[in-house]
């Protein structure tokens, strides 16, 4: 098949399930002069994404190298068609290689160029939606952030760029499914179903119950959290209901499962959040500290934004999973720290993630490489045998009142 024998074997393995599509796309491969590899196209697309001029010039040089390499130009053409012209479903981008043998220290720029090829398509989507220029600018700037020192590729290889896994994540932005609104990024999603929430019709209190058959450690975190599993006295939550009541194990707003079965009369407690409930998914890009007031404005603006531009898609809660939601942070950090104050505004719940006995990769050094107060506290915590976890949170839209700590001020039925 045209060009396939010029492609290195790692690429061939990834593309083997799509060999028929490969064959079709290669029929249209120009003999020379692929448009999205031209200097003008690269420069315009890089500028649109807020990429600095010196990096744009490097991308132009790398694009020229790709154009001159039969294997790389064939792969780039295939991905261009499979991502931006006629989406191929089932591509596991996390398994695709980085072309280090051909592009050396610039290997991470290959997938950047593949993303830049999709800029015209993205521009068309934004135009149809009437997207504000400020939101567009802030959203597409995520590519530049991911290419830089805060990105996983730079931390691994010491050079700018992205790998295929990061490209797969950035598809949420290139498909116009994720938007940066202030400090955070948001997208329409739905609750995965690890907890359910019930509201009292008499007091307005909100209680989360674990889904059925979840195993918890004695401390109330998920079995496996922080790399710890199978401890004695671990326990399994159940969730069941009758015509008159719901019975299950509660999750405290601070993020720990409680080994005490409670009963919620259905005449008073109404289910308001469960698997499939529409949410605003919440992501935390690299950036400045999470100033408390800035965080609140970001969430408030996100509510207004999605109600304006996607009125046909209502949502009932914010939701996220992240290292910043580790429920042990209040025991490590001061109560006035940004992370602890953020946690107090939302309803935390345990989930199966965490860096265990290593520092979360997202923790940054201060200016001049000096350890920050957070890093020092985290190091002391690890030295004492502590483990890091991740956590989840939800915040019902009707409870949003930044600074009020709604779930920590309510009475709980246990």
Regions found by a protein language model. Name each.
Residues 290-308:
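Conserved acetyl-CoA-binding loop-helix of GNAT-fold acetyltransferases
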Residues 319-326:
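Short beta-alpha junction loops
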Residues 2-290, 311-317, 331-414:
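Non-catalytic substrate-recognition and accessory regions of acyl/acetyltransferase enzymes
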């Amino acid at each position: 098949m045209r060009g396939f024998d010029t492609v290195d074997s790692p690429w061939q393995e990834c593309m083997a399930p799509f060999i028929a599509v490969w064959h079709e796309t290669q029929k249209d491969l120009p003999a020379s002069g692929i448009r999205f590899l031209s200097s003008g196209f690269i420069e315009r697309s890089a500028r649109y994404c807020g990429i600095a001029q010196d990096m744009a010039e490097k991308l132009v040089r790398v694009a020229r190298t790709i154009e001159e390499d039969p294997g790389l130009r064939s792969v780039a053409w295939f991905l261009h068609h499979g991502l931006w012209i006629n989406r191929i479903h089932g591509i596991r981008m996390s398994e695709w290689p980085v072309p280090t043998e051909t592009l050396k220290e610039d290997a991470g720029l290959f997938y950047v160029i593949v993303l830049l090829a999709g800029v015209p398509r993205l521009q068309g989507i934004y135009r149809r939606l009437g997207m504000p220029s400020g939101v567009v600018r802030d959203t597409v700037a995520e590519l530049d952030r991911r290419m830089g020192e805060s990105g996983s590729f730079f931390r691994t290889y010491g050079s700018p760029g992205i790998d295929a896994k990061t490209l797969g994540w950035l598809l949420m932005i290139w498909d116009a499914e994720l938007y940066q609104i202030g400090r955070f990024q948001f997208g329409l999603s739905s609750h995965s179903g690890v907890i359910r929430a019930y509201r009292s019709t008499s007091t307005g209190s909100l209680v989360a119950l674990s889904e059925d058959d979840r195993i918890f450690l004695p401390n109330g975190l998920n079995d496996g959290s922080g790399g710890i599993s199978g401890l004695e006295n671990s326990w399994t939550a159940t969730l069941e209901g009758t015509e008159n009541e719901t019975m299950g194990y509660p999750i405290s707003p601070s993020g720990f499962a409680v080994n005490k079965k409670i009963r919620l009369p259905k005449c008073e407690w109404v289910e308001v959040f469960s698997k499939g409930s529409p949410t605003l998914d919440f992501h935390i890009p690299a950036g400045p500290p999470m100033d408390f007031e800035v965080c609140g404005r970001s969430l408030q603006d996100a509510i207004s934004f999605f109600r304006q531009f996607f009125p046909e898609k209502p949502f009932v809660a914010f939701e996220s999973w992240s290292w910043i939601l580790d429920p042990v942070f209040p025991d490590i950090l001061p109560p006035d720290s940004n992370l602890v104050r953020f946690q107090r505004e939302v309803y935390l719940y345990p989930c199966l993630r965490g860096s265990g006995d290593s520092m979360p990769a997202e923790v940054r050094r201060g200016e001049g490489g000096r350890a920050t107060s957070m890093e020092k506290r985290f190091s002391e915590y690890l030295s004492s045998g502590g483990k890091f976890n991740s956590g989840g949170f939800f915040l019902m839209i009707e409870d949003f009142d930044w600074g009020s700590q709604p779930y920590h001020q309510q009475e709980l039925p246990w």
